[in-house]
Amino acid sequence: MSTFAIPRSVEWHETHVTILNQQKLPSVTEYLDLHTLEDVHDAIVTLKVRGAPAIGITAAYGLALAASRYETESVDEFQRRLKQDRDYLASARPTAVNLFWALDRLVAAAKSAASVNEAKTTLVHEAIRIQIEDEDVCRRIGEHALSLFHRGDRIMTICNAGSIATARYGTALAPFYLAKEKGIELSVYALETRPVLQGARLTAWELMQAGVDVTLITDNMAAQTIKAKNINAIIVGADRIAQNGDTANKIGTFGLALLAQSFGIPFYVAAPLSTIDLATKTGADIPIEERHPDEVTHLNGVRIAPEGVNVYNPAFDVTPNELITAIITEKGIVYGDYETELPSLVAKEEHHETA
C-alpha cells in the first residue's frame, strides 16, 4: 500500500477555524485563521473555501464559533440568535445544499439542550462529527467509484471535487486516491474550469501532491481529448442533486455530459447523500448563482476583455438525469430511476441514523 500526502482544507480550534486558502493555490500554500462569523461568511463568498462538503463543514464550525460567544443565559435568546446567524451563513452560497444541511443539523442538535452551556458544547461536538463523518463518507464513495474503473483507465473530470473540497479524499477524486493506495494505475484528465480555474489551480495541484497521474487541459479541449486520448469515463461532483437526479455542478458539467453521450462513455456523478435535496423536485427548481463579471473579464487582476462588454457568468449548470449513467453515494451506486431510488436511499439512511 502506498503512502502519500492528501491535503486537508478545514481544521477546528477552540478560538478559530483554520482553512486552506484555495484562492492562493497553486502558487502559495496559505492557511487562514477565521475568528468571526463574518470571516467565515466572507471565506465562503470569496471562494477561499469551496466545494459543497467543505463549505458545510466550515459553516458548521463558524456557527459553533459564533454561538460560543453569545453572552446570554436565556435558552430562548440563544436559539433566536443561533437561527439568525444560521440564516446569515446560509446566504453565502445559495446553490450548495450541504451548506444548509450542515447549518440545519447544528440548529436541530442545539434544540435539545437544557442550558446555554450545553447548547454551546453540543454545537462544537456536532460540527466535529460532521467533519469526521464526511471523511468516512468520502472514502466509501471512493470505494464504490473505484469498482467502476479498471487498471489503466483514463478518466476526465471538471472543477475540484477533491480532498480540499471535503473533509478528506473528496468525491469525484476519491477513487484516484484509493487507486493510488492500492497500486492501481489510473490517469486523470482535468479541465481547467474557467473562469475561476478550480481544475487548474486545485485539482491538478492536489493530485500532483499525492503523485496521481494528471493531465491538464483547457475546457474547450474536452471533445478532442476524449477522442484522441480514448477517455474511458467522466466523473464529476455535485453541489445539489434534485429528487429526480438532475444535478447542479460547476458550469461546464452539462456540456461534458452531452459529450459523454455523444462518445458513448459513462458519465458518473459522485456525491454524498447530504447533497441530495428531496425538497427540490427537478433541476428547474435549483437556484443558479451568478457571479461578478470580473471573474470573466479579468485574469489575475488584469483586464482581458473590452471594458463595458456584457457578461453572463453562471457559476453552475444543471445536468438532466437522463444524461447521468449513475450517481455514486456512500451507500452504493444508483443506476437510473432516480426519482424512486434516491428518496429510498435517503430514507434508509435516515432510518439507520434514528434506529
Curated annotation (Swiss-Prot):
Protein purpose: Catalyzes the interconversion of methylthioribose-1-phosphate (MTR-1-P) into methylthioribulose-1-phosphate (MTRu-1-P).
Site (described: Transition state stabilizer): 159
Subunit field text: Homodimer.
Catalysed reaction equations from the record: 5-(methylsulfanyl)-alpha-D-ribose 1-phosphate = 5-(methylsulfanyl)-D-ribulose 1-phosphate
Family membership noted in the UniProt record: Belongs to the eIF-2B alpha/beta/delta subunits family. MtnA subfamily.
Protein name from the UniProt record: Methylthioribose-1-phosphate isomerase
Active-site residues, record numbering mapped to chain: 239 (proton donor)
Chain positions recorded as substrate binding sites: 50-52, 93, 198, 249-250
Pfam families: IF-2B
Keyword Amino-acid biosynthesis: yes
Cysteine pairs bridged by disulfides in the record: none
Domain of life of the source: Bacteria
Key word Amino-acid biosynthesis present: yes
Enzyme Commission number(s) of this protein: 5.3.1.23
Any one Gene Ontology BP term: L-methionine salvage from methylthioadenosine
Molecular function terms, GO-annotated: S-methyl-5-thioribose-1-phosphate isomerase activity
Ranges in a coiled coil: none
Biochemical pathway: Amino-acid biosynthesis; L-methionine biosynthesis via salvage pathway; L-methionine from S-methyl-5-thio-alpha-D-ribose 1-phosphate: step 1/6
